[in-house]
C-alpha cells in the first residue's frame, strides 16, 4: 500500500503502515469511504486470494470495529469485489485420519491455531478472480481527481491499483482516521528452529536439548536417525503403511548435577507449599505456635524476595530419550525454542533482520503491531489451575465457573479474582437491537504498564473466550485493580 485517501486527506503509507499527510481535498468526499492505492508488480495478473490487513491500533475498544469489517463493501475499477474474513492459507494435503487427530493436539499446532484466531479478525481476503487487465492503473482514481488540486495531481505520477472500501455507519470519521491498512502482512511467532546431531550408543539413548540464556523449549519438530527412521512421541499404527518408526519421550531435568537452576526451582516449589499450608497453623489455639507461624511468614517473604533476585536466566534442561534403537548411530533432532516474556513489548515499527537468506527485501521487514502473548512456563500453583480447567470444562466454556477458571488459567498469579455479571448493550450490527452480554470484570493484583497492555489483554482474552463459548455469549471485558 503506497497511498490511502480517508476523510478528505491523502496519506502516504510506509512499510510499517505509518501514515504521512500529503494533501487535503479541496471538496468534500463521500462519507465512510476509504481509497487504498496499491503498487502492484507487473508479474501479478490477478488480485484473487490477496489478503488485506486492517487495524485500529490507537483505539482501546477496537474489537467491535474489527467485528464489523466483513460488513464493508469493496470495489476496484467500479466493479464490486467479494471479500471473505481471514487470511489466505494454502490448502494442505489430506493426512491419514489417525495421524491428523494426534497432530491437532500437538503443541505447535495448538499454538499456531490460537495465533491465527487472534489475527484472523484483522484480515479480509479477495475470494473471486479480479483480473488486473480490467482495472485501470492510475495515479489517482477518476472519482478523486476533481477533489485535489493540480499541484497534488502533478506529484502523483506512479500508476497504482485503487481499491475502494465503504464502511458501515458505525464507523465515524474519527474512527476511520485511526485506520491502518496494508498487504503482504503475516502473523509472526517468537520461535527459533534448532538442529542438533548427536551420536548415540545402544545402551545410552539420552540427548540433551540445548537452550541459550532466556530461551525455553517449545516443542520437538522432528527426530530422525542416520538410517532415515523417524521417531514420534506417540506410537500409533497407520493402516496400509510399511513405514517403520520409533518413539521417544521428553524429560525435564533429573539427568544433571544439582545447580542454581535446580535450587531456584526447588525454592519456588517450597514457597508455593508454604503459602498453601500456612493458614492451617493459624487455626491452632496455641499462642506460641501462632507466633512461630508469623515468623515463618516473614521468613517466607524474605525467601521469596531472594528467589526473585537469583540471576539465573536458563531453564532446567530438557532431555530427549529414545525408547529403542536397532543399532548405534547418529540422531538428528529439530526442535523449537522461544524467548517467552522477553519477546513481549517490542514496539511497532521495529525493523527485523532475517536469520537466513530469504526471497524478501530485508529493508521492508518490520513489525506493524507491538508483540505480546509470550509467557513463562507455568509454576506449580498455575499448573493446578490449568488441570482444574481442563478436568472441569473439557475445553468448553458454558457456566460462570467455567469463565472464571478460564481467566485464571490464562492470567495465572496476575489475577486476584474474577467477577461475572449479566448485562445489556447496543449491538454493533445494524439489524440487531439490544443484546445480552457477559460482563467479565478482571481484578488484577499488579497494575499493567499502560493502556496498550490492557487493550492487548482484553483482545486476547475476548478472542480465546469466544472461541470456546457458544455463539450466544457476547463478552465485555473490564480490567480493575485490587485496592486491598
Question: PLM features: what roles do these ranges have?
Answer:
Residues 1-484:
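Intrinsically disordered, low-complexity, polar/charged repeat-rich segments
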Amino acid at each position: 500500500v503506497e497511498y490511502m485517501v480517508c476523510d478528505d486527506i491523502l496519506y502516504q503509507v510506509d512499510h510499517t503502515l505509518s501514515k504521512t499527510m500529503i494533501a487535503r481535498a479541496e471538496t468534500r468526499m463521500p462519507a465512510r469511504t476509504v481509497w487504498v492505492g496499491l503498487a502492484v508488480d507487473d508479474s501479478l495478473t490477478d488480485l484473487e486470494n490477496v489478503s488485506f490487513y486492517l487495524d485500529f491500533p490507537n483505539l482501546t475498544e477496537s474489537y467491535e470495529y474489527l467485528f464489523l469489517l466483513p460488513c464493508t463493501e469493496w470495489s476496484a475499477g467500479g466493479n464490486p469485489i467479494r471479500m471473505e474474513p481471514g487470511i489466505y492459507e494454502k490448502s494442505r494435503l489430506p493426512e491419514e485420519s489417525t495421524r491428523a487427530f494426534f497432530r491437532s493436539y500437538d503443541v505447535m499446532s495448538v499454538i499456531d491455531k490460537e495465533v491465527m484466531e487472534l489475527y484472523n479478525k484483522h484480515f479480509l481476503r479477495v475470494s473471486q478472480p479480479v483480473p488486473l487487465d480490467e482495472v485501470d492503473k492510475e495515479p489517482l482514481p477518476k472519482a478523486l481527481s476533481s477533489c485535489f488540486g493540480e499541484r497534488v495531481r502533478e506529484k502523483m505520477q506512479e500508476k497504482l491499483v485503487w481499491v475502494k472500501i465503504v464502511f458501515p455507519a458505525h464507523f465515524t470519521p474519527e474512527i476511520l482516521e485511526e485506520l491502518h491498512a496494508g498487504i503482504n502482512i503475516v502473523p509472526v511467532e517468537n520461535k527459533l528452529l534448532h538442529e542438533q546431531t548427536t551420536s548415540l550408543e545402544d545402551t545410552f539413548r539420552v540427548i540433551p536439548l540445548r537452550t541459550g540464556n532466556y530461551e525455553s523449549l517449545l516443542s520437538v519438530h522432528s527426530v530422525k536417525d542416520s538410517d532415515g527412521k523417524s521417531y514420534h512421541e506417540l506410537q500409533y499404527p497407520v493402516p496400509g503403511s510399511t513405514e517403520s518408526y520409533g518413539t521417544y519421550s521428553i524429560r525435564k531435568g533429573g539427568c544433571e548435577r544439582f545447580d542454581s537452576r535446580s535450587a531456584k526451582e526447588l525454592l519456588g516449589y517450597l514457597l508455593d507449599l508454604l503459602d498453601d499450608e500456612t493458614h492451617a497453623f493459624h487455626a491452632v489455639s496455641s499462642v506460641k505456635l501462632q507466633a512461630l507461624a508469623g515468623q515463618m511468614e516473614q521468613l517466607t517473604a524474605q525467601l521469596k524476595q531472594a528467589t526473585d533476585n537469583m540471576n539465573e536466566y536458563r531453564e532446567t534442561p530438557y532431555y530427549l530419550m529414545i525408547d529403542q534403537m536397532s543399532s548405534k548411530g547418529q540422531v538428528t533432532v529439530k526442535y523449537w525454542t522461544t524467548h517467552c516474556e522477553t519477546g513481549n513489548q517490542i514496539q511497532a515499527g521495529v525493523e527485523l533482520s532475517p536469520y537466513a537468506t530469504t526471497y524478501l527485501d530485508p529493508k521492508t521487514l518490520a513489525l506493524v503491531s507491538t508483540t505480546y502473548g509470550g509467557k513463562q512456563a507455568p509454576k506449580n500453583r498455575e499448573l493446578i489451575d490449568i488441570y482444574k480447567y481442563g478436568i472441569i470444562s473439557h475445553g468448553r466454556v458454558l457456566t460462570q465457573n467455567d469463565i472464571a477458571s478460564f481467566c485464571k488459567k490464562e492470567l495465572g498469579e496476575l489475577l486476584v479474582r474474577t467477577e461475572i455479571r449479566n448485562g445489556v448493550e447496543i449491538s454493533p450490527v445494524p439489524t440487531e437491537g439490544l443484546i445480552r452480554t457477559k460482563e467479565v470484570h478482571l481484578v488484577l493484583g499488579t497494575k499493567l504498564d499502560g493502556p496498550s497492555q490492557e487493550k492487548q489483554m482484553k483482545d486476547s482474552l475476548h478472542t480465546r473466550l469466544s472461541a470456546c463459548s457458544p455463539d450466544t455469549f457476547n463478552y465485555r471485558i473490564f480490567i480493575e485493580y485490587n485496592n486491598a
